[in-house]
Amino acid sequence: MKNLIAELLFKLAQKEEESKELCAQVEALEIIVTAMLRNMAQNDQQRVIDQVEGALYEVKPDASIPDDDTELLRDYVKKLLKHPRQ
């Protein structure tokens, strides 16, 4: 039983580390996108936003992906493009 608990704790620690890595990657990408958008002329910014929104609109999510997850992604992308990090 102790071995099972130790193994589960080890796996949990691994998952936590993976989660931290993913969070760091997302944060880095947010910073990069924000910096790029801020350094673009307004018309170039709008063109990028329109292209990203168009690409999102054309994507048909897999049926196994819950609608809530798809909507969460779309909302987050819109938020990032319209109101980049302060």
Swiss-Prot record:
This is Anti-adapter protein IraP. Keywords: Coiled coil, Cytoplasm, Stress response. Residues 1-36 form a coiled coil. GO terms for cellular component: cytoplasm. Inhibits RpoS proteolysis by regulating RssB activity, thereby increasing the stability of the sigma stress factor RpoS especially during phosphate starvation, but also in stationary phase and during nitrogen starvation. Its effect on RpoS stability is due to its interaction with RssB, which probably blocks the interaction of RssB with RpoS, and the consequent delivery of the RssB-RpoS complex to the ClpXP protein degradation pathway. It comes from Escherichia coli (strain SE11). It is found in: Cytoplasm. Its main location: cytoplasm. The gene is iraP. It comes from the Bacteria. InterPro entries: SigmaS_Anti-adapt_IraP. Belongs to the IraP family. GO terms for biological process: cellular response to starvation. Interacts with RssB.
